[in-house]
């Protein structure tokens, strides 16, 4: 077999006669924890909410897995699924934005980087938005902003509590100001939700950064976070260069932010649904049938 044929077979996914290493995440039978190196069956890892049984490391999960962990089985009703991003600036860096969108849509099965809808948690009705980091790093463009805004408005109209699961690199630069204005738009909708005396809880997962942190991620009545999640605005290196000093090793972690009053509580993923149910009951939320508006 020539070298050219070997690479051609590799591209087709055919065997080359060599033993190749299984991916560490998801596609093979086994998964290796990047923190402690523990190797476990993927099935066992998924059965533990994708949390390492050895060290508690929270592996990244997609929006569908997240919804399954939060919502009562069969209770999630998606909203505004038809909204699809455009390319208003005909933006191109190393690649065209339109190509990046098509690639992300094909890889994730999503139209954009957030899934929104209504659900029940232990029988209690709640509005839920889940950002998906697989879609262009969870970046917030006009569709992400519009879907979250519509969900907040729906929650306000129905007098429902709201949970937004944040996982984002920030505003989507390929949409320019159309992306940045989503920060103010969502914040305005959340203020009306607050004025209606309704509960809003953001859940900060790894990573939550940039314009998402600078807007709706930090506007909650109760700010929740997953253990060791990276949470910040600018990158660590940028801050160190600006301040000209070394930052603590745990800087921009969920634990650091909790110690400094920016996060109210850290909730392990395996305890999330029960913790949410307790918080909803504590704030007087009630069972409710979810019907189409």
UniProtKB/Swiss-Prot annotation:
EC number(s) recorded for this UniProt protein: 2.1.3.15
Any one annotated GO CC term: acetyl-CoA carboxylase complex
Cofactors: Zn(2+)
Entries under Pfam families matching the protein: Carboxyl_trans (PF01039), Zn_ribbon_ACC (PF17848)
Keywords: ATP-binding, Cytoplasm, Fatty acid biosynthesis, Fatty acid metabolism, Lipid biosynthesis, Lipid metabolism, Metal-binding, Nucleotide-binding, Transferase, Zinc, Zinc-finger
InterPro entries in the record: AcCoA_carboxyl_beta (IPR034733), Acetyl_CoA_COase_Trfase_b_su (IPR000438), ClpP/crotonase-like_dom_sf (IPR029045), COA_CT_N (IPR011762), Znf-ACC (IPR041010)
Chain ranges of zinc fingers (C4-type): 33-55
Keyword field contains Lipid metabolism: yes
SUPFAM superfamilies on file: ClpP/crotonase (SSF52096)
This protein's pathway: Lipid metabolism; malonyl-CoA biosynthesis; malonyl-CoA from acetyl-CoA: step 1/1
Subcellular location field: Cytoplasm
Family membership: Belongs to the AccD/PCCB family.
Subunit and partners: Acetyl-CoA carboxylase is a heterohexamer composed of biotin carboxyl carrier protein (AccB), biotin carboxylase (AccC) and two subunits each of ACCase subunit alpha (AccA) and ACCase subunit beta (AccD).
Function: Component of the acetyl coenzyme A carboxylase (ACC) complex. Biotin carboxylase (BC) catalyzes the carboxylation of biotin on its carrier protein (BCCP) and then the CO(2) group is transferred by the transcarboxylase to acetyl-CoA to form malonyl-CoA.
Designated name of the protein: Acetyl-coenzyme A carboxylase carboxyl transferase subunit beta
UniProt lineage: Bacteria, Bacillati, Cyanobacteriota, Cyanophyceae, Synechococcales
